[in-house]
C-alpha cells in the first residue's frame, strides 16, 4: 500500500483482485457483508481449494445461506462451549509445557505448539475418547491436507476447468478427500455400534442428525467444514500464540510488567480455572492485541466478490463480481492509524485510547467472523499465562529475525516466530 495507495488491485492468475488497507473503505465494504459472494474456489484460489474446502462454511454467502451453513456449528463454538472446555485447554497446555527443554533454543513450530490447539479442537469436535485413541490419525490427515493444499500455489491449478483433468494434483485432492471421508465414517460406525462414546462432540451429534435428514447441510458440507475448523485454521491459532511468546521474549520490560500482573491477580492459580481472563488481566489483553497487530495471522483476508453493479470503495468504483481482500499488514502498520507502528507498544490498546474502527483486522469482520475465535483467544491466553508463571523467556541466540515459511497457503502469514529460550523461575 505504500507503493500503490490504500486501495489498489493485483492480478491473481487472470483475475483482478482489489486490495483494501483503508479503514473507511473496509468499514464500507463490510456493512454489506451478507451479500458478498464467495465461490467454491474462493473466487481465485482454484481447483485445489474447491476440491477440499469448496463447500465449507467459509464459502457461504447471503443471509439465509450463511445461517444454513453456520447454524449447525455455532453452539459448539459459543462462549458457553469454550468455557466448558477450559479444563481441556489447561490440561493440554500443561502437558505441552512438560515436554519443553530448558536453557536451549526452542522452535515452537518444530515442538508442535499447534498440537495444543489441535487437541483441544479435536476434543470439541469428537470428544475425549477419540482424542486419546485416534489423535495420531488426525495428525497424519493434517499433514496430508497441508501437503495437498500447498499445491494451491501452483498457478496452473487456478485455470478454468483444471479440476476436470486427470493430473497428479487432482489425484492428491481425491486421495485426501477419500481418506478424510473414510476416517470420519469409520468413527461414526464405531459410535453407532457403541464402541466409542461421542462425549457431546460436534461430529457425532451432527452426523446423527444428518442420518435423519434433520439438518439442511449434507455430509460433504460437514466434512469440508471440519477440514476448515479442525485441520486448516490451527495455523491461525498457532501464529497468534507463538508470536505473543516471542514478542514477550524480545521485550523484557513488557514481559516483566505482564508477569507482575499475572502473579498479583492469579496468585499462582491455574489460568484455565478462570473464564474471564481478559477482564482480570487487562494488560495481557493489550499485549495480545499488539502482538496480533504486528503479526496478523492472515496476510490477506479471504476474497469476497462484490454483488452491486458498482461498489464505491475509497473513491474508486468497483464493478460487480470483483474479488476484494483486506491487506492486513498494510492496515496494521499504517501510520494513518498507528503512531510509530514498528514499535511494540501494548499501551496503544488501553481503554483510554480510541482505535479507529476498521483499522485493526484480527479475526475478520461481520457475520462471517472466524467461528473459532473464542477458542483461539482462550488458548492463547492460557498458554501465555502458563508460560510466564513457570518460565523466564528470552529470544534464541539474540536472533530477532522472523523466519519465512517454505510452504503454506498464500493468504496465511508467511512468517514463523524466532526461537525462544526458557529458564525456570
Question: Residue spans of the language-model regions?
Answer:
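Conserved cytochrome P450 K-helix/beta-meander segment immediately N-terminal to the heme-binding cysteine loop
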Residues: 326-353
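N-terminal membrane-proximal hinge/A-helix region immediately C-terminal to the signal-anchor transmembrane segment
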Residues: 1-53, 64, 68, 90-95, ...
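Cytochrome P450
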Residues: 11-18, 82-91, 101-123, 131-140, ...
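Cytochrome P450 catalytic core segment centered on helix I
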Residues: 139-215
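Central I-helix of cytochrome P450 enzymes
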Residues: 106, 117, 121, 179-187, ...
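Cytochrome P450 heme-thiolate "Cys pocket" and heme-binding signature region
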Residues: 53-55, 59, 314, 350-382, ...
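Cytochrome P450 heme-binding "Cys pocket" and the immediately downstream C-terminal segment
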Residues: 254, 375-411, 415
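Conserved cytochrome P450 K-helix E-x-x-R motif and the immediately C-terminal K′/meander segment
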Residues: 1-5, 185, 189, 269-314, ...
Amino acid at each position: 500500500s505504500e507503493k500503490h495507495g490504500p486501495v489498489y488491485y493485483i492480478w491473481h492468475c487472470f483475475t483482478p483482485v482489489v486490495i483494501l488497507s483503508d479503514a473507511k473503505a473496509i468499514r464500507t465494504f463490510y456493512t454489506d457483508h451478507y451479500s458478498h459472494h464467495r465461490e467454491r474456489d474462493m473466487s481465485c484460489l482454484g481447483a485445489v481449494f474447491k476440491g477440499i474446502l469448496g463447500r465449507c462454511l467459509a464459502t457461504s454467502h447471503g443471509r439465509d445461506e450463511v445461517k444454513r451453513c453456520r447454524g449447525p456449528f455455532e453452539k459448539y463454538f459459543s462462549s458457553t462451549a469454550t468455557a466448558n472446555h477450559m479444563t481441556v485447554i489447561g490440561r493440554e497446555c500443561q502437558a505441552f509445557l512438560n515436554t519443553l527443554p530448558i536453557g536451549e533454543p526452542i522452535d515452537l513450530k518444530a515442538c508442535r505448539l499447534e498440537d495444543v490447539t489441535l487437541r483441544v479442537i479435536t476434543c470439541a469436535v469428537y470428544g475425549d475418547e477419540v482424542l486419546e485413541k485416534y489423535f495420531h490419525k488426525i495428525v497424519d490427515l493434517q499433514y496430508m491436507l497441508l501437503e495437498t493444499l500447498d499445491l494451491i500455489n501452483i498457478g496452473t491449478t487456478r485455470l478454468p476447468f483444471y479440476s476436470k483433468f486427470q493430473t497428479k494434483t487432482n489425484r492428491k485432492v481425491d486421495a485426501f478427500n477419500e481418506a478424510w471421508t473414510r476416517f470420519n465414517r469409520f468413527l461414526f460406525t464405531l459410535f453407532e455400534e457403541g464402541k466409542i462414546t461421542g462425549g457431546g462432540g460436534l461430529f457425532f451429534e451432527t452426523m446423527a442428525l444428518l442420518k435423519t435428514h434433520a439438518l439442511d447441510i449434507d455430509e460433504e458440507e460437514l466434512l469440508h467444514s471440519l477440514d476448515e475448523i479442525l485441520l486448516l485454521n490451527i495455523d491461525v491459532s498457532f501464529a497468534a500464540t507463538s508470536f505473543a511468546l516471542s514478542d514477550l521474549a524480545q521485550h523484557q520490560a513488557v514481559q516483566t510488567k505482564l508477569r507482575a500482573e499475572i502473579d498479583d491477580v492469579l496468585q499462582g492459580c491455574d489460568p484455565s480455572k478462570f473464564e474471564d481472563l481478559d477482564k482480570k488481566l487487562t494488560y495481557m489483553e493489550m499485549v495480545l492485541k499488539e502482538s496480533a497487530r504486528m503479526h496478523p495471522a492472515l496476510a490477506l483476508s479471504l476474497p469476497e466478490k462484490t454483488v452491486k453493479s458498482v461498489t464505491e470503495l475509497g473513491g474508486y468504483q468497483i464493478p460487480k463480481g470483483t474479488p476484494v481482500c483486506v491487506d492486513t499488514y498494510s492496515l496494521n502498520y499504517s501510520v494513518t492509524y498507528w503512531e510509530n507502528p514498528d514499535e511494540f507498544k501494548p499501551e496503544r490498546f488501553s481503554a483510554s485510547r480510541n482505535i479507529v474502527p476498521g483499522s485493526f483486522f484480527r479475526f475478520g469482520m461481520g457475520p462471517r467472523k472466524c467461528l473459532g475465535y473464542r477458542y483461539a483467544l482462550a488458548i492463547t491466553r492460557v498458554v501465555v499465562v502458563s508460560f510466564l508463571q513457570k518460565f523466564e523467556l528470552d529470544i534464541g541466540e539474540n536472533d530477532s529475525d522472523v523466519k519465512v515459511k517454505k510452504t503454506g497457503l498464500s493468504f496465511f502469514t508467511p512468517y514463523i516466530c524466532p526461537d525462544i529460550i526458557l529458564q525456570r523461575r
